[in-house]
């Protein structure tokens, strides 16, 4: 049961960090050209 809690905490933490970075720096991906 503890493993489930730890996994949930890990996933939620990663998700929060991911969303924080995503909203802080909105992905501006140019469809044409990498420059």
From Swiss-Prot:
One of its GO terms (cellular component) is chloroplast thylakoid membrane. The lineage of its organism: Eukaryota, Viridiplantae, Streptophyta, Embryophyta, Tracheophyta. Its main location: plastid. It is found in: Plastid, Chloroplast thylakoid membrane. One of its GO terms (biological process) is photosynthesis. Found at the monomer-monomer interface of the photosystem II (PS II) dimer, plays a role in assembly and dimerization of PSII. PSII is a light-driven water plastoquinone oxidoreductase, using light energy to abstract electrons from H(2)O, generating a proton gradient subsequently used for ATP formation. InterPro entries: PSII_PsbT, PSII_PsbT_sf. PSII is composed of 1 copy each of membrane proteins PsbA, PsbB, PsbC, PsbD, PsbE, PsbF, PsbH, PsbI, PsbJ, PsbK, PsbL, PsbM, PsbT, PsbY, PsbZ, Psb30/Ycf12, at least 3 peripheral proteins of the oxygen-evolving complex and a large number of cofactors. It forms dimeric complexes. Coiled coil: none annotated. Keywords: Chloroplast, Membrane, Photosynthesis, Photosystem II, Plastid, Thylakoid, Transmembrane, Transmembrane helix. The keyword Signal does not apply. Belongs to the PsbT family. It is a single-pass membrane protein. The chain crosses the membrane at residues 3-23. This is Photosystem II reaction center protein T.
């Amino acid at each position: 049961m503890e493993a489930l809690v730890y996994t949930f905490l890990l996933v939620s933490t990663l998700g929060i960090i991911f969303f924080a970075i995503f909203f802080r720096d909105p992905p501006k991906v140019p469809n044409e050209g990498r420059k």
